[in-house]
Amino acid sequence: MLKCPETKTVWIYTDCQIKEDVSDIFDLIEEGKLYMVEDKPWTQRRGEVWHNSGVVGFVGKPPILYQWVKAVKENPTVGDQETLHSILNPITKIGNIADLPNRYNVMRLQVEHDSYKGPVSIMHWTGRKGKDRIRNML
């Protein structure tokens, strides 16, 4: 993410399926924060707000991006999403993360377990079962 030469960036994991034109996402992101979708399944199961790192929008290189990269390099044994969550508390999260609408990163668990019926612009095929679904689409 740090090496991306563009001013406005939307980072999308390779296990995400773009289901329609998502270019309007660039109209939602502004300087100074990471723009992410709340990870509704993790928030529900863990009892605190989590954001999913499958789709991350930002303008320029906000300071939190450097902190996140540094923390991932220092502790490569856990996932990047867990690392970001660990370096933020509820107050610093407000200053560093802004919510994107859910449709830009709908988790597999939302559809398969939580009866999500809303719009899906980007489907995130998480976990082993998600990777199996991707293989079946190829």
Language model segments and positions:
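Catalytic core and acceptor-binding pocket of nucleotide-sugar-dependent glycosyltransferases
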Residues: 59-138
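Short, solvent-exposed loop/turn segments at the edges of secondary structure
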Residues: 50-53, 118
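Alpha-helix initiation/capping motif
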Residues: 3, 51, 101-102
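GT-A fold catalytic core of metal-dependent nucleotide-sugar glycosyltransferases
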Residues: 1-48, 57-58
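Short, charged, surface-exposed secondary-structure boundary motifs
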Residues: 43-51, 131-135
